[in-house]
Swiss-Prot record:
Keyword Secreted: yes
Keywords, in A-Z order: Secreted, Signal
Main location (coarse class): secreted
Designated name of the protein: Kidney androgen-regulated protein
Cleavable signal peptide: 1-18
Subcellular location: Secreted
Gene encoding the protein: Kap
Amino acid sequence: MMICKVLVITVFCVLTVAFPSLDIDSINEELQDSIFDILNSTSDFQLASYEPSTSPPEDSTYQESNTDFMQTTYSKSIQISELSNGAETVSSSFLEEVTETSESTVEFPLAETTTFSSTS
């Protein structure tokens, strides 16, 4: 359906560019009216054919009681460090304590910086 709309608009633009010096205002108005009628009829058809479904899908795995995905809690999380070869297991309470303390600052080692001085 989108291709149809793009095609109609493209044809309209091509006709407008192809005949700019001719007095075709009446033809352009008729063409515009027909384009708008076509677009309105297709959009009305699409809206009429769409009927929203209020009933849940009839799937055996659908459970209405478990809709909140944020209830899942994990007892441990895995943190992978770039410096170590393996993974460290850190308890979630430790992560919560670290994120709750906003007073402490974390310092990361920076790469060696080289300063160049230019003499003029």
